């Protein structure tokens, strides 16, 4: 029987075709391509719309228990090496396809309004389309090697998009920082993939899992080696999903245009790391030590990201640290074995965070005519305030996203966060406490952002680009920007209902890894949900007291000065990296240069000097005068006779 899954290969092909078409147009017919910019954007959106329809059909087929589908082509076949490429569709793939395509198409529609007057409008659409293609290809990959290829393509596209405004020094530095930081994780990922191939002779997930089980039965050394290779693979998600200690690139990535910030943080780059851990879950779950390492990496990242977010002044960077914290939740859940809860939170967070970032972009777009185009001003929350009165759609959308991310029922993230905390309570009370505390901090910093930006009195007319007082006020964004906000608002309200614990339709993912569905316990649910909602409300009320009622933020900062300084300086992690890696490498380079000049060059120059002196000496002897030669012969003979006479006198 024919399955819709066999057409899954078309899903990344459509956006790839659009990206290539624009690329060829920009190279060969730049002027005509820029004139037809609106038609190109419509074409890209239409092509991605076809991919979205196919993704939804595949998801529905998987929900209806359609078997997983795999198509493999043997690309390289030798006596001792086999490389296969193709595509693989299972429930995890189906969910990720829908998340990526829905968020991507809404971001593209939003971009049409946000970037309409940017000179790089067409180029940006080409990059976005290629970025989406790379993530879709990664999701469909049937083996580790193919995942690595698309993994690198995702990294390349992020480099291009973060540095899209490359004339800005900050953007140029940010894309380099993201690229270099991710190289650390990618190098570990590559070594881990090659290590597992060396152990098992395969890049296929199921083959690796089966052979590792067999090897572990014979030799404990194989187990330790497998844990090490698993750790190397985990370095890839640590970097890509901005986990501690390779998280430092993510806030700087905010130098790119806001639509790409939404796509990176919601459905593509950072989601790739969680997806890889999910795909490797049957392998990682064989090693308890590795699972504990994953869980604690996520927990530490969650609390660090949350504590840094509470003092951010830049709106987009505050949301960036929020993403870091929520990704920590997902990785922690994977490490605890909460496969479904982690992926459920990935889905709910994707829509809520896309809503928050696009709302932030709409706010920044409204601030630009007042304070100018400098990100230090139009993203500065201290220059905002009361914007909901002037931009009601944007303000209400941001409020819904905030309520969802804080875990307020019945919005989307409440159900997924509650599922993670419920599993954490059973797995480890300490992990539960970290997750519970992070939930309170999440509520505090999110409502802090909301109150600073959308409530109170507008503070932006006190400064503009020319430092002259302005009486302008923000205006609501155009329909192309507000329509995606409305759609994402609906998703942020309703998408979590498919995973409620008393009617969980999301549990079909469980069958991928053969886990049993635990019965619903109303008492446990009320305790976990009540405690998480309680701490969230406490965080919200604390933010209200400080930023709305009292409005004396200095008193709050002085009261908790050590913690405030630690948070404001981002735990000094960037400073430590600057001192060790940047300044350290610079000092090492200077010392190497000095060694090269004084020692290496000195040795080479000394050799040349010796050659020069000896050649000059020989040249003075070989002067062509016969009397000089006779004199030299006589002198040599006399010297030999003198030595001989001395020798014989000593003997006698």
From Swiss-Prot:
Entry keyword set: Chloroplast, Membrane, NAD, NADP, Plastid, Plastoquinone, Quinone, Thylakoid, Translocase, Transmembrane, Transmembrane helix, Transport
Catalytic activity: a plastoquinone + NADH + (n+1) H(+)(in) = a plastoquinol + NAD(+) + n H(+)(out); a plastoquinone + NADPH + (n+1) H(+)(in) = a plastoquinol + NADP(+) + n H(+)(out)
UniProt GO MF annotations: NADH dehydrogenase (ubiquinone) activity; quinone binding
Subcellular location: Plastid, Chloroplast thylakoid membrane
Membrane topology: Multi-pass membrane protein
Listed InterPro entries: NADH_UbQ_OxRdtase_chlpt_su5_C, NADHpl_OxRdtase_5_subgr, ND/Mrp_TM, NU5C-like, Proton_antipo_N
Coiled-coil parts of chain: none
Transmembrane segments: 9-29, 40-60, 91-111, 124-144, 147-167, 188-208, 225-245, 258-278, 289-309, 327-347, 354-374, 395-415, 424-444, 482-502, 526-546, 630-650
GO cellular component: chloroplast thylakoid membrane
EC number: 7.1.1.-
Any matching Pfam family: Proton_antipo_M
A GO biological process held by the record: electron transport coupled proton transport
NCBIfam families cross-referenced by the UniProt entry: NDH_I_L (TIGR01974), PRK06590.1 (NF005141)
UniProt similarity note: Belongs to the complex I subunit 5 family.
Function: NDH shuttles electrons from NAD(P)H:plastoquinone, via FMN and iron-sulfur (Fe-S) centers, to quinones in the photosynthetic chain and possibly in a chloroplast respiratory chain. The immediate electron acceptor for the enzyme in this species is believed to be plastoquinone. Couples the redox reaction to proton translocation, and thus conserves the redox energy in a proton gradient.
Subunit structure: NDH is composed of at least 16 different subunits, 5 of which are encoded in the nucleus.
Protein name: NAD(P)H-quinone oxidoreductase subunit 5, chloroplastic
């Amino acid at each position: 029987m024919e399955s819709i899954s066999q057409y899954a290969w078309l899903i990344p092909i459509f956006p790839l075709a659009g990206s290539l078409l624009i690329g060829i147009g920009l190279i060969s017919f730049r002027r005509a391509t820029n004139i037809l910019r609106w038609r190109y954007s419509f074409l890209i959106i239409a092509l991605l719309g076809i991919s979205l329809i196919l993704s939804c059909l595949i998801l529905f087929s998987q929900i209806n228990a359609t078997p997983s589908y795999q198509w493999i082509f043997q690309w390289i076949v030798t006596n001792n090496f086999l490389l296969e490429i193709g595509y693989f569709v299972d429930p995890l793939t189906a969910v990720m396809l829908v998340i990526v395509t829905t968020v991507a198409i809404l971001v593209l529609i939003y971009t049409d309004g946000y970037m309409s007057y940017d000179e790089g409008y067409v180029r940006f659409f080409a990059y976005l389309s290629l970025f989406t293609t790379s993530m879709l290809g990664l999701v469909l990959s049937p083996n580790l090697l193919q995942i690595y290829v698309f993994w690198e393509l995702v990294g390349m596209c992020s480099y291009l998009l973060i540095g899209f405004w490359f004339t800005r020094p900050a953007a140029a530095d940010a894309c380099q920082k993201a690229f270099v930081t991710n190289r650390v994780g990618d190098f570990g990922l590559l070594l881990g993939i090659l290590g597992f191939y060396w152990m098992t002779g395969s890049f296929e997930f199921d083959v690796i899992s089966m052979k590792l089980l067999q090897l572990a039965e014979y030799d404990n050394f194989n187990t330790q080696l497998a844990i090490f290779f698993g750790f190397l693979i985990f370095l890839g998600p640590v970097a890509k999903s901005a986990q501690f200690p390779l998280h430092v690139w993510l806030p700087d990535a905010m130098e790119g245009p806001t639509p790409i910030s939404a796509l990176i943080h919601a459905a593509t780059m950072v989601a790739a790391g969680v997806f890889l851990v999910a795909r490797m879950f049957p392998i990682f779950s064989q090693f308890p030590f590795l699972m504990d390492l994953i869980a604690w990496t996520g927990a530490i990242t969650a609390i660090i990201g949350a504590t840094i977010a509470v003092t951010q002044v830049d709106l987009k960077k505050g949301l960036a640290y929020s993403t870091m914290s929520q990704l920590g939740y997902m990785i922690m859940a994977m490490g605890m074995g909460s496969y479904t809860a982690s992926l459920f939170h990935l889905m709910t967070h994707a829509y809520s965070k896309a809503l928050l970032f696009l709302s932030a972009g709409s706010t920044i777009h409204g601030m630009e005519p007042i304070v100018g185009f400098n990100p230090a001003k139009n993203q500065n929350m201290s220059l905002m305030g009361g914007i909901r009165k002037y931009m009601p759609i944007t303000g209400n959308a941001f409020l819904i996203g905030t309520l969802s991310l804080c875990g307020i029922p019945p919005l989307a993230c409440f159900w997924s966060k509650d599922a993670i905390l419920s599993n954490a309570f059973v797995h480890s009370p300490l992990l539960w406490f970290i997750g519970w505390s992070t939930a309170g901090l999440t509520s505090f910093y999110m409502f802090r952002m909301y109150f600073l930006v959308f409530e109170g009195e507008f503070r932006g007319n006190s400064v503009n680009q020319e430092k002259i007082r302005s009486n302008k006020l923000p205006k609501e964004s155009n329909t192309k920007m507000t329509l995606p906000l409305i759609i994402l608002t609906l998703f942020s309200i309703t998408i979590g209902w498919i995973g409620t614990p008393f009617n969980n339709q999301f549990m079909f993912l469980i069958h991928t890894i053969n886990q049993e569905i635990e019965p619903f316990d109303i008492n446990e649910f009320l305790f976990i949900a009540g405690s998480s909602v309680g701490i969230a409300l406490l965080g919200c009320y604390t933010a209200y007291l400080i930023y709305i009622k009292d409005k004396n933020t200095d008193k709050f900062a002085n009261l908790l000065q050590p913690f405030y300084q630690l948070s404001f300086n981002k735990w000094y992690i960037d400073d430590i990296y600057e001192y060790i890696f940047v300044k350290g490498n610079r000092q090492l380079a200077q010392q190497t240069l000095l060694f090269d000049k004084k020692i290496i060059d000195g040795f080479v120059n000394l050799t040349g000097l010796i050659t020069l002196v000896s050649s000059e000496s020989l040249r003075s002897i070989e002067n062509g005068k016969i009397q000089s030669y006779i004199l030299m012969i006589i002198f040599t003979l006399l010297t030999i006779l003198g030595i001989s006479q001395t020798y014989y006198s000593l003997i006698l």
